[in-house]
Amino acid sequence: MKMTFRWYGDTDPVPLAYIRQIPGMVGVVSAIYDVPVGEVWPIDRIRSLKEKIEAHGLTLEVIESVPVHEDIKLGKPTRDTLIVNYGQTLRNLGACGVKVVCYNFMPVFDWTRTSLEMPLPDGSTTLAFDTQAIRELDVSEGIQLPGWDASYRPEQLKALLRDYEALDEAGLWANLDYFLRAIIPVAKEAGIKMAIHPDDPPRPIFGLPRIVKNRADLQRVLDIVDDPANGLTLCSGSLGADLQNDIPALVREFGARGRIHFAHLRNVQTNAAGDFHETSHRSADGSLDMAEIVKAYFETGFEGYARPDHGRMIWGETGRAGYGLFDRALGAVYLNGIWEGLAKHPADHAAE
């Protein structure tokens, strides 16, 4: 398991020098954030980013993400040109040594939360999702949430939502099918493994279809193009927001088949209504057994990339919600510690 850390470029409050100091940290996960969605990432920009990261003793082998344009998700006539551009970006990334590209197929909105600073009893703050609050939001009035790859003006958002009114889950599946059949051969040629990120949260929101929510959906994605280049970002926190998803079982099934290319490891406290908040990575603090999840990766021989995903804001830190240094660093060390214990004493855990 190669431990990595998300970095948002020069505007990120967390400097590369600090990331390098996290024990066991080998790489950075990043992207080029100022190229408009749908345009080709220039190879010189990719090289520059890679050189900057490597100068701090870290690798750039995972990109998160190359956003998929809404016209591709909607199946508009412009999608063919956009897919060609996407493929050229993959070729440029592959030429620079990138191995994995994380992406998602969520309509309009990326990961969604209703609070960025929910207070916890210990004084830290965290990201939270309240189902009722989402139901009461009027997205047509224009809202901006973290994690989006684009910020829409109210009129743009209204137009997009109108476009999606005519698209159900079957239509979105058809458009994902079209995209993957076109792009996976290009990715394979470029030496890149595509890794789809599950929907976060794993259910429809704002009346929009969501199709990567559970085991059946993950299997269906892989069946579209049955090739190792078509794989998964298995996000424990996203899928774990649905109590019906057995995360260790998913890791064992898809990991044993070599189809998990990127592991997002975080814990969430979830209730039956679908409300959740993010916790520390420690198993006891959330609904997920993180030790068992890491054990599943270990037992399936996982050699891919992992990151501690989101973290709380602790010790007075300010910055990008969910992406501070301190709690994610603690998470990385905790996860690597579980792995080291399994590696040094495998017989102690074999019968558990």
Curated annotation (Swiss-Prot):
Coiled coil segments of this chain: none
Catalytic activity: D-mannonate = 2-dehydro-3-deoxy-D-gluconate + H2O
Named cofactor requirement(s): Fe(2+); Mn(2+)
Gene3D superfamilies named in the record: Divalent-metal-dependent TIM barrel enzymes
Keywords in alphabetical order: Iron, Lyase, Manganese
Biological process (GO), any one: D-glucuronate catabolic process
InterPro entries: Man_deHydtase, Xyl_isomerase-like_sf
NCBIfam families: PRK03906.1, uxuA
Identification of the protein by name: Mannonate dehydratase
Organism: Paraburkholderia phytofirmans (strain DSM 17436 / LMG 22146 / PsJN)
The organism's taxonomic lineage, starting at the top: Bacteria, Pseudomonadati, Pseudomonadota, Betaproteobacteria, Burkholderiales
